[in-house]
Regions:
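Glycine-rich, basic loop-to-helix element that forms the pyrophosphate-binding segment
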Residues: 58-72
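Conserved donor NDP-sugar-binding/catalytic core segment of glycosyltransferases
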Residues: 85, 91-113
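Short aromatic/hydrophobic "clamp" motif used to bind/position activated sugar donors
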Residues: 77
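Conserved nucleotide-sugar donor-binding
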Residues: 73-74, 116-130
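N-proximal low-complexity "stem/linker" segments adjacent to membrane-targeting elements
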Residues: 1-50
């Protein structure tokens, strides 16, 4: 005999769940932060006109990340480098499926098992809980942030680098 839950899973696959994600309404609770020192910002140029990014120009990458996040008010933070085509639809789908203890981003290089700061999504409450990015670190702030997220119970969702 087939249980009801098995029927439900078949139905949900057939319904294409991501088609029902309203991208604009998902982004109502999102802040896009782009640390940058460049005059031309390819990422900002690739954003839909209804997304207003926070350009963080402070000296020091981790300082810029933290100050940019502090100036925003979205529950979800998308931290992204200044030289990519912003994946609007992918970002909305990920956020729609995420829990506040999730951190999603591009997989780090082997043998590391974290994610890169090139594209990273997390909830503001997790960022606050772990104390943000360590501003005393000139390098490796993304790795340190992920380690501290994991140590506090966060789950890391690693995406293939080729996505972005």
């Amino acid at each position: 005999m087939v249980e009801e839950s098995q029927f439900e899973s078949v139905r949900s696959r057939e319904q294409r769940p991501h088609e029902s994600v309203d991208i604009r309404s998902t982004f109502e609770s999102v802040s896009v932060v782009i640390p940058t020192v460049r005059e031309q910002n390819f990422t900002a140029e690739s954003l839909p006109d209804w997304i207003e990014p926070e350009l963080a120009t402070e000296e020091g990458l981790n300082i810029a990340r933290n100050r940019g996040i502090e100036r925003t008010d979205g529950d979800w933070i998308v931290l992204v480098d200044d030289d990519v085509t912003f994946p609007t639809r992918l970002t909305a789908w990920l956020i729609d499926a995420m829990h506040p203890l999730h951190v999603a981003g591009l997989e780090d290089y082997w043998p590391m098992n974290g994610i890169l700061g090139r594209f990273m999504i997390f909830h503001r409450s997790l960022w606050k809980h772990v104390g943000g990015f360590d501003e005393s670190r000139p390098h490796g702030g993304d790795t340190d942030f992920i380690v501290r997220c994991r140590n506090t119970g966060g789950a890391v969702v690693r995406l293939p680098r080729r996505l972005i």
